[in-house]
Amino acid sequence: GEAVFGAGKGKNSFLCLTYGTGVGGAIIENKQVYHGSSFSAGEFGAIITHAEEKLSGTDPFDGCYERYASATALVKMISAVDPSLINGRQIFANLERPEIKEVVNKWIDEIVLGLATLIHIFNPSCVVLGGGIMVQPYILEQIHARIPQMVMSSFAHVQISSAELGNSAGLLGAYYLASQKL
């Protein structure tokens, strides 16, 4: 949906990541979704960002991006500081609290590490960030400030934007694909 009707409209190649319970997404190349050999491409949450955790863990997602960068990860990290904050809205309503802001900033560091890896691998013109948590302006502001220091200068041109379609992206994408088959 984002490729045709939203933030990716008119872009030839871009990545779309969704942060929620986990981290998933899509790779768009030449205005087409890249599916991979088993139609499973875009499992960005499975990228290993913490090798020591992966090597010592037993769960397939130990040490992986979504364990540290998903909205679920943020809520879990915040619960160690204030268990009464159980969702993104509550967390960002308390962002002025130094202890909350510190945890949020560590979480954004995790997001940026994964994004920098993906930017270096795919060299997209644009990265679209979706999921309910990504409507918080502070997150995108911080990502814009941090990405240039995390990527090689030849990759710093990448545009990073919020998804525009919210929860309608999947439905609109399915509609578009079905209409192309008719």
Residues covered by each model-derived region:
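Glycine-rich phosphate-binding loop of actin/hexokinase-like ATP-binding domains
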Residues: K11-C64
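ATP-binding/phosphotransfer module of carbohydrate and carboxylate kinases, centering on a glycine-rich
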Residues: V4-N12, T49-L182
